[in-house]
From Swiss-Prot:
It is a peripheral membrane protein. Residues 549-565 have a biased composition (Basic and acidic residues). One of its GO terms (molecular function) is ATP binding. This is Serine/threonine-protein kinase atg1.
């Protein structure tokens, strides 16, 4: 595939929203990295981040910043052409330091500067990388830029410039500028370091403060972890953590979540300890301690950092070949330096036909940038983009044209929409080609150690602690935060902790896991949430503002649940939509709301709606009525049952909200990506009047209000689910439960319970992030619609009183009409569904649909009665029921609560009678099929779908 002057080759990396390919210049045969971003998967925030990244990279040209070479936009993708870095990132470089001597690009470096046995990298290499990192940071600070995500994964490495002169490199990269691979500082015989990924970067003058939570936890400054405003010094903390990791081999602070990480930092009280056998010099240790000050006021500032002796002084301990003959940085005369012929320094790419050990270090940059720095003339040279040139391959048959430079056509960059604040924002994709087998083997080794089931010993305890630390580090490598509300951070941090816990994963084979993270170790693309064809095109559940709200997640993970309501393409959506829409022709109970059959978007909920499926265990039904059973259950099984019931209730509320949401957004991305709807999509774009699906402003306001309060209710139930799982996990950690009797039982029930809880947690995390994103969209839609109302309308912003904000959890800048509450909407819908189902039952119409309607109504009413209190185990049932009767929930008062309880009891009775009737009909049926008896009326076409398995 041709992209401008480049030919796209094999895929070498994949993220949630972009795919990275190896590319080659069609004429010079020099290599590039092509990052193809799928626009249909980007929400407003991601598009804004991408636009910001492109804007920043357009103006940055420095040898230690990865260059953006070109940019091409089509109707469906944006293709970013970037410099190709072949040695991967610094984290892999450190992790695989013991094998660097076997790699052809680094064997000479290891021969000259072997890694010390008590440390990570040789101090010569550490100082070399630090000098180059400082050079890039100084360039950024001169332009009031803060990167906000300095970490080893964003520091990419290229082969040393001298390796090209020796003929070691066979594949040559395309140069973003004349000096792209001429180091501004450091040694030409060592790998070249470049900063990558400017998705979080922003302009921040020295006197300004920011308050956006960005970066990766292990490298976050404590002021960011405390949700305080911060300045550019946050980057210096990250530099300190990176420097420590280069010296020691692991981050200075490791934890399973950001809360625990902050606790460890505070507990350390600025006492940075180094292993006794570590050979780092006192200068390096002093610099690390100065950078890792908790209080940013006490932390080393940028001028002092740039003037530190480690940065400015020559590197001690150089071999004779690397001793400088004359000062090279900075040149005495910039013009003379520019006119002096430079060595033909180049950075290459790993040859596809290389050895396995060579290929496993291969890496492709993510969103990146590039530029050249040669003081003192850098301000003049960096004002405009330099000429773009390629590198010539020595001894290659593909000789470049006689002119060594090739002008790059002016790059055109689309105008992106203005930024919109979101309650949560998706993390960036990690476009990395990691060695999955290596990573899996590392983690499996730890899991096998734990899963042997032998009694706990000191040696095993040490291994378990090491596994926990490794899990914490893996979690941190996977996590990025952008504009994340505190609750979202907690939800995603806990889900990551559980997914990476060796105690959860210990007894499970890798192939059987369904909730594990797979972003970095998996580059083959996201696994669809449902194997059915319509779902496969959707990917993640994020649709109309599609993207991973962190956390990333969107995680590139497999679905937490493989079993759905059925295997037909419509079964995943019809089970809930049938129940929600069979009740009445008046879809919302509002005269102006158009019925479902005439909406442009088709059926509702949307195609991407993935209902929560109860886990298929012997002790529970696939779809239950919420009735209590008297079977004695242990604590783990009780937790699983309560957690799954709470998640199911949240899913029913979510399905109701989706009906409203679908009316507001008739052309969701799930429909846009459907090939059958492309023609309609073009028509909609041409007709601006159809943007709101033909709804009046009043209808938009009402639908937005109803969707918003329902999403808030769903969020509260999802948060409670996380709290239940969190309380269970805390009890396990306090008692080290997986090593006690609970885990040592022969039947392994506790192991299964842990797996099921983890699966539910991963599902809840994805749904929580999705609801946050959609809730933010609905909130903005409501605010916009309210402004379009007549000035004398009660809902117009000018008529809002100060104290009239919604008390049910909506944002403080949103005011909804009096009487609009999630509980009332849910009660009315449940009552309507149950009444309609009762009528259909009496007339013998769609008995299977009646069962679904009854169950859905029960779940919805249970959600109305739901409180935010986490159940306490060991509490008697009688006490629980007494306490629950006294609780006043949101808009549900005590008297109203009794009405709801009686209605639930009545519906359960009708459901029990219906199931008896269905059982009798099933026995009379000539064949064991789930078809409705022929005497009944045909199914409503709106609600056609597979019946849930019993």
């Amino acid at each position: 595939m041709s992209i401008g002057r480049y030919t796209r080759l094999d895929e070498i990396g994949r993220g949630s929203f972009a795919t990275v390919y190896q590319g080659v210049h069609t004429k010079t045969r020099t290599y590039v990295a092509i990052k193809s971003v799928n626009l249909s998967k980007l929400n407003k925030k991601l598009k804004d981040n991408l636009s910001s990244e492109i804007h920043i990279l357009k103006g940055l040209y420095h040898p230690h910043i990865v260059a953006l070479i070109d940019c091409h936009e089509t109707t469906s993708h944006i293709h970013l052409v970037m410099e190709y870095c072949a040695l991967g990132d610094l984290s892999l470089f450190i992790k695989r330091r013991d094998t660097l001597g076997d790699h052809r690009y680094t064997r000479d470096m290891i021969a000259k500067y072997p890694n010390p046995p008590g440390g990570a990298l040789n101090e010569v290499v550490v100082r070399h990388f630090l000098k180059q990192l400082a050079s890039a940071l100084k360039f950024l600070r001169d332009r009031n830029l803060i990167h906000r995500d300095i970490k080893p994964q964003n520091l990419l490495l290229c082969p040393s410039p001298s390796s090209y002169r020796s003929g070691v490199t066979q594949v040559v990269p395309f140069k973003g500028s004349e000096d792209s691979f001429n180091p501004a500082t450091g040694l030409e015989s060592l790998p070249l370091l470049k900063i990558a990924d400017f998705g979080f970067a922003r302009s921040l003058p020295a006197t300004s403060l920011a308050e956006t939570l960005c970066g990766s936890p292990l490298y976050m400054a404590p002021e960011i972890l405390r949700y305080e405003k911060y300045d550019a010094k946050a980057d210096l903390w990250s530099v300190g953590t990176v420097l420590y990791e280069m010296v020691v081999g692991k981050p200075p602070f490791r934890a399973t979540n950001h809360v625990e990480l902050l606790r460890k930092i505070e507990k350390g009280e600025d006492r940075i300890k180094f292993p006794e056998e570590n050979p780092a010099s006192d200068e390096i240790k002093a610099l690390i301690r100065a950078l890792l000050k908790r209080n940013p006021v006490e932390r080393l500032n940028f001028p002092d950092f740039f003037e530190n002796g480690v940065i400015t002084s020559p590197i001690p301990g150089l071999v004779a070949d690397d001793q400088p003959s004359i000062p090279r940085d900075p040149p005495a005369d910039p013009e003379t330096a520019e006119s002096t012929p430079r060595p033909d320094s180049r950075s290459g790419a790993i040859v596809p036909g290389g050895t396995e050990r060579e290929r496993e270090v291969s890496y492709l940059p993510k969103g990146d940038t590039g530029l050249t720095q040669r003081p003192p003339s850098q301000n003049q040279r960096f004002g405009t983009p330099p000429t773009t040139t390629h590198m010539r391959r020595i001894g290659s048959g593909d000789r470049p044209p006689s002119t060594p430079k090739e002008l790059t056509p002016p790059m055109t960059y689309p105008q992106r929409p203005s930024a919109v604040s979101h309650a949560t924002a998706p993390g960036r994709q990690e476009l990395v080609d990691r060695n999955a087998a290596f990573t899996a083997m590392e983690r499996q080794r730890g899991r096998n150690t734990f899963s042997e089931g032998s009694p706990q010993t000191d040696r095993q305890a040490d291994k378990l602690r090491e596994e926990r630390e490794r899990a914490a580090q893996d979690v941190a490598f996977e996590r990025d935060y952008v504009v994340v509300e505190k609750r979202a951070v907690e939800v995603n941090a806990f889900a990551d902790e559980l997914a990476h816990s060796p105690r959860i994963q210990g007894g499970i084979s890798r192939g059987a896991q369904t909730g594990a993270l797979s972003r970095r170790s998996t580059v083959h693309g996201p696994t669809p949430l449902n194997p059915s064809p319509p779902q496969a095109t959707v990917g993640k559940a994020m649709q109309v503002l599609s993207g991973r709200s962190r956390a990333d997640s969107m995680h590139n993970r497999q679905s937490s649940y493989e079993r759905r309501y059925g295997q037909s393409p419509t079964s995943a959506t019809s089970a809930i939509s049938k129940a929600l829409n069979m009740a009445s022709g008046r879809l919302f109970g509002m005269g102006f709301s158009p019925p479902l059959a005439i909406t442009k978007g088709g059926r509702s909920p949307p195609l991407a709606y993935n209902p929560f499926p109860a886990y298929p265990a012997h002790g529970s039904l696939m779809i239950g009525d919420g009735a209590k059973n008297n079977v004695a259950l242990d604590e783990d099984t009780k937790t699983v049952q309560i957690l799954e019931e709470c998640a199911t209730r949240s899913d029913v509320v979510y399905g109701f909200a989706e009906v409203k949401y679908k009316q507001l957004v008739p052309l969701a991305p799930s429909v846009q990506t459907d090939p059958s709807s492309k023609g309609n999509l073009a028509g909609e774009r041409e007709n601006p009047d159809s943007a709101d699906g033909g709804l009046t402003v009043d209808a938009i306001v009402t639908l937005s209000e109803e969707a918003l309060v329902l999403y808030v209710k769903a969020l509260s139930l999802l948060a409670k689910s996380m709290d239940i799982a969190g309380a269970w996990w805390a009890r396990k950690n306090r008692g080290d439960g997986f090593g006690d009797s609970a885990m040592s039982r022969a039947d392994g029930a506790s192991t299964l319970a842990g797996t099921r809880i983890n699966n539910v947690v991963q599902w809840v995390r994805n749904r929580f992030n999705e609801v946050l994103e959609k809730g933010e969209f609905v909130r903005l839609k409501l605010i916009e619609a309210q402004k379009r109302l007549p000035p004398d309308h009660p809902s117009h912003p000018d008529n809002h009183s100060v104290g009239s904000s919604l008390g049910s959890g909506a944002s403080v800048d949103v005011v909804v009409s009096p009487g609009v509450s999630a509980e009332k909407l849910m009660y009315d819908r449940a009552l309507e569904m149950s009444r309609t189902a009762a009528i259909n039952e009496l007339t013998g119409e769609d008995l299977s649909g009646c069962e679904i309607a009854y169950v859905t109504a029960i779940r919805m009413l249970e959600a109305v009665l739901e409180n935010g209190e986490v159940p306490r185990f060991g509490q008697g049932k009688d006490d629980t029921s007494k306490d629950s009767d006294k609780i006043v929930l949101d808009a549900v008062q005590a008297e109203e609560r009794q009405v709801v309880i009686k209605l639930v009891s009545s519906i359960r009775s009708r459901l029990a009678a219906l199931r008896k009737k269905l059982a009798i009909l099933a026995k009379r049926a000539p064949t064991p099929s789930a078809n409705v008896p022929s005497k009944m009326a045909p199914l409503n076409p709106v609600s056609v779908g597979a019946t849930p398995p019993k």
